[in-house]
């Protein structure tokens, strides 16, 4: 029986709206210069740790696609198969998309802000169809009716996990090293599943931008090390703390 392959998770590098502290969701924004540098460094880390991917999965959003391209280029793996799916997209933040996080917190209060941002099953108010930051006219999502109008993390789990188990796991089972370049909440959804985290536990999980997270899995697709291993633990801890602090001030 072939050994199970390694799984490498990577949140996209810092985006323009990360830097501005805005709720992004499905709005298609690019990377900052810092985010591009993070993407290049992530590829270097992957190569240094001999985790050269055989296949890459990413979302339909440019911040993830660009990160993936830069990381693969840095690791000299631009030639591997790339598979994109909306199921790896960031959580849709509904009517919060485009809003400043600190201003939203000040307007609605800490409790409501954190419920929308980090709870497992509380979605923000839905976005209005045809509004500035909606996706109902985006051709990428024509086959799914323009996509959701809002999501909680449970919704992301429901759309991502079937794709993981039905598609991605097949590559892992034949020993391939799989790189997933996605988003804070789509990766939180996957980590919740892998580590069998409770709904309460997942509230406190923050995934930093641009730092690869390695999971080695057994034949049942359970991690040998719960929580995986960041390839740059010190930078990951600092990055996660920065994510946790968004909305302050």
From Swiss-Prot:
Record lineage: Bacteria, Bacillati, Actinomycetota, Actinomycetes, Mycobacteriales
Alphabetical list of InterPro entries matching this protein: His_Pase_superF_clade-1 (IPR013078), His_PPase_superfam (IPR029033), PG/BPGM_mutase_AS (IPR001345), Phosphogly_mut1 (IPR005952)
Cellular component terms (Gene Ontology): plasma membrane; protein-containing complex
Pfam family, one: His_Phos_1
Protein name as catalogued: 2,3-bisphosphoglycerate-dependent phosphoglycerate mutase
Keyword Disulfide bond part of the UniProt annotation: no
Active site: 12, 90
SUPFAM superfamilies attached to this UniProt entry: Phosphoglycerate mutase-like (SSF53254)
Organism whose genome encodes this protein: Mycobacterium tuberculosis (strain ATCC 25618 / H37Rv)
HAMAP family: PGAM_GpmA (MF_01039)
Function: Catalyzes the interconversion of 2-phosphoglycerate and 3-phosphoglycerate.
């Amino acid at each position: 029986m072939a050994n199970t392959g390694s799984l490498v998770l990577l949140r996209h590098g810092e985006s323009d709206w990360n830097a501005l502290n805005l709720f992004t969701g499905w709005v298609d924004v690019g990377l900052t210069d810092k985010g591009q540098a993070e993407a290049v460094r992530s590829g270097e880390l992957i190569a240094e740790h001999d985790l050269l991917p055989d296949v890459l999965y990413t979302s339909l959003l440019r911040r993830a696609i660009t990160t993936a391209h830069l990381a693969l280029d840095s690791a000299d793996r631009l030639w591997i198969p790339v598979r994109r799916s909306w199921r790896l997209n960031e959580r849709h933040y509904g009517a919060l998309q485009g809003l400043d996080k600190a201003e939203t917190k000040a307007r609605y209060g800490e409790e409501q802000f954190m419920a929308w941002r980090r709870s497992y099953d509380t979605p923000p108010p839905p976005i209005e169809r045809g509004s500035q930051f909606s996706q109902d006219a985006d051709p990428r999502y024509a086959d799914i009716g323009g996509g959701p109008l809002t999501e909680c993390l449970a919704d992301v789990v429901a759309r991502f996990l079937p794709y993981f188990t039905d598609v991605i796991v097949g590559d892992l089972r034949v020993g391939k090293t799989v790189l997933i370049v996605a988003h804070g909440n789509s990766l939180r959804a996957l980590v919740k599943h892998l580590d069998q985290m409770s709904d309460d536990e997942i509230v406190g999980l923050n995934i930093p931008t641009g730092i690869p997270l390695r999971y080695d899995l057994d034949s049942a697709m359970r991690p040998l090390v719960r929580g995986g291993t960041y390839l740059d633990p010190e930078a990951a801890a600092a990055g996660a703390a920065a994510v946790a602090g968004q909305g302050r001030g």
